Amino acid sequence: MAQLWGGRFTKETDQLVYNFNASIGFDQKFYRQDIQGSMAHVKMLARQGILTEEEKDKILEGLQGILDDVENHRLEITSEYEDIHSFVEANLIERIGDAGKKLHTGRSRNDQVALDMKLYIRDEIREMDGLLLELLKTLQKIMEENLHTYMPGFTHLQKAQPITLAHHMGAYFEMFRRDRGRLYDIYRRMNFCPLGSGALAGTTYPLDREYTAELLAFEAATRNSMDSVSDRDYLIELLSAMSTIMMHLSRFCEEIIIWNTNEYQFVEIDDAYSTGSSIMPQKKNPDIAELVRGKTGRVYGALMSMLTTMKGLPLAYNKDMQEDKELTFDAIDTVKGCLALFTGMLSTMRFQKDRMEESAKNGFTNATDAADYLVGKGVPFRDAHGIVGRLVLYCLEKKIALDDMTLEEYQKISPVFGEDIYEAISMKNCVEKRNTIGAPGADAMRRVLEENRRYLEEEKF
């Protein structure tokens, strides 16, 4: 058992207790960040005269050697160590001797792990941001190619009004754009360095916390040492933001699953992103979309676990907080995997454009435009609404669409109808005359696409 404490104990730790308490099985995930933080700490200690330049150089060389050996698989992180901190320190002392014993001067594992987690989360946020950016670029491409691909828009899963595929994809563009914004907000709010806070009450050593923060690219040092070691707000915020990302992916997947059915046939998922059945040879299943939808609950669960863990903890650090890592790591890996797979599936998906437009025509999605036509002829909207309701009922009885009615049939229900009704309710006209901000008309969508292009070129981090 390699651990960083034990002087005041008269007995060896029970093996079951040691195993239960140890975190090396999961906190080894941020070995790189642990070494990065230690390097900055050592440079600061030397700058403040707490370490000599010779000691600093020796420790830095030893830390770099550990990092290189781990990354090149020459050194294995094993369960004989309690945590990643003890692994690094024990190996450092073994390599460079007594100088390595000075690494932890002016530092506690409480502020050390708080730093490691923040460094790790910063890296992961940047990675997730890159994955969201690729998804947004994929959506932008689909939008640009489908300004005139008409389809039904839905409310209550029933056909409502005609829109375009570009407009539908644009709704998801907005969702994932907001997701990027949330990640950026979390990054900005958490970007303060906790190192130097000690166990909870700072330290008597003359540490330069601002210098350490600068070395590690933080905005500044944290302002309260107790909060620094017990703050997990940024993890709760991240898990909430990731839950929202997964909710958006899940909604999108649900639509793809529906659109992929024989009853809709709006899309065909590429073979590379589909699976079959062990008994039914005809099956081509949307398993990726279903798994993304299913994994959403897993990320929600991590958020609820984190909230529950933190809800009753008095200041400052408590061992309960060790539970933050496994669930956060798992949620991050889940979200990144889902984003990458979903983007691949979406970019290879084939949209059945003719089927989409035919579905819009057969679902009375132009009924609102028929009512608007009557309003334009001077009929009060409430009366127009009732007239078109009778038109729809007539079409249902005859099993025809509004476009299929003769002018004589129209005029039997209302003499206000003229030959121009057919142009008024054409799919193209229904969509293209809607050009206010946020509407599906091509002119409105071109403005959106241009703004999207500028947005996609911006640097977030």
Could you describe each region identified by the protein language model?
Residues 145, 182-185, 189, 218-222, ...:
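Conserved helix-loop functional segments at active or binding sites
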Residues 216-308:
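Acidic, glycine-rich loop-and-beta core segments that form the ion-binding/anion-interacting portion
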